Curated annotation (Swiss-Prot):
Residues 209-230 are annotated as: Disordered. Residues 346-605 form the Protein kinase domain. This is Class II receptor tyrosine kinase. The gene is TK. The modification Phosphotyrosine is found at residue 527. Phosphorylated. Belongs to the protein kinase superfamily. Tyr protein kinase family. Insulin receptor subfamily.
Amino acid sequence: MWSSPGRNLESGRFNITPRYTGTLSNGSVSSSDKVALSQLTIFNVTVADEGEYTCSVDGESASFRVDLGDSNSSGSNSGVIAGVLITLLLLIALIIILICVFWVVWRYRRRGKFDLGSCRELSCSSCSCVPLLAALKGVKLPTRHRENLNKNGTRLRLNERNHIADTNTEIYSVVQKPLKKISKSPPPLPPLTLTETELNELMSIDEKEELSPIQEKPTRRNTGLSTYSQSGTIPKLAKLTKLRKFKMKENPIYQSADELELELELQVDNTLYALPSKPNSTRNSASFTDDLASDPIYSVAINPSMFTKRSSTIGNDDDLHPYGPIYARPIKQKMRQPLNVSVDNIREVKQIGVGQFGAVVLAEMTGLSGSERCVPTKRDPSMLNGVALVAVKKLKPDVSEEVRQSFDKEIKFVSQLQHDSIVQLLAVCTHSKHPFIVMEYMENGDLNQFLQKYQMVDDDSALYSNQIPPSTLLYMAVQIASGMVYLSSLNYVHRDLATRNCLVGSNFRIKISDFGMSRNLYERVYYRVRGRAMLPIRWMATESFYGRFSEKSDAWAYGVTVWEIYTLGKKQPYEELDDQDMIQDAIRGTGRRIMGRPRGVAGCV
């Protein structure tokens, strides 16, 4: 209850700070202990009149005065007067500054120049405003509080705090008791709300026992006082002071470092792991140890007892390593050396293109040993046993030394290519004034011209000579993919993959070649840059337009090549765009135009 001398007021609800609950009751004022009242939070208090009020909780109380005043009180009038006074002082300071400025300008117009005396006088005049500004600093502007009115048009003022007197709105405010001396130390924490049974269990813990971590139990929060508040005594928590110190126990599975044995005995049951004698290879003999001992990559023969005898970690290198390093000294593979021929072995048929180093011609070659992969021509039946159809790459005359070195590097690289889907280097001629290299050629020509002779059918039944099913086209695409994977494993970038650079043999065998970009037959599919460089822009990825070629750009070109295969070479990629539009669409990056799905493309493509 709220109590006031000579008045009976309505009861009000209140809330005490966490972990302390209670109810208001009438009681006398106690001057010795008023700490708990500083933690009270009272809301929705309804008072009938101003006066002196007392709040009591559990024998502790505090008194304060409540003033009910109009919104148009004398405090607001004093605020208006202070505001007018400040405005007048500001106007006086502004007038003084303006007079000083005009005076200095007049002196300048009269004398025609500024002097130190004028500046000194202006500074002294301006400093006269300093006292006025200092006076303004000491004036407190009135603070405008929000007018919280009740039904009677009055407001409740409680220790310079505004409290809404309307009980329908819940507003919290802390009631602080007046203290003569403010203490810097924080108020003590309120006790935990525990039941008597929980407290007895907590205080009855045996200090001799090992204390386990205390699990916090959920406590009930009720609006009434707990049993401790009603009894008038506040319990204290038991202090957990005698906790057992943490100490590392001795682990029986470990020993000190000084007692460790330096020898290790392997528990082997005379059986060896079934490891192959070489990586990615199978055993050639019945016994694994036979392969292991006779394998040429080992420097010494290996005895199986080496794996079962007692060994020491401080042994010599021969005991620890019974065989020499496997990868430090690998077996040197014999480099495949191409056959050296002369100009007399070449009989040119026709020119088929112009490559990086010079012209590329189709020729017949006689007396070529080891030409099992070459296809004999049908032009001269009497020379079927000694004539092969080949492609000859010539080096331009009068080239620089740098170009000559690049030509030699290509010979060394291409001579090592050995794959069923890559054309082979057959012979070279490096001692002549006009050096050249001889490459394998297929009797059916390039893939682009080969596909244009056919018509696509949906199934493999009743095929005519000019019909081709989608399964055969997929077989061609798989062969090209196999060859490109092989080139990628050697870090080789083709840069010009297309059906025109793929050759066709018997039974639809496909081999990747690179006979030059500016062939007369396909000159229209290349874009000439500044009259010299020629780029296959319709097969190029976006980054290739900026000079970056990689395995990813070859993958893009492979996708366009597959599109060519399923259109039977009868359509040009992006044929609806001219060269300039093609370049603009490619360098745009995101949102680049994608070609339509051709007929007969399988779901796995």
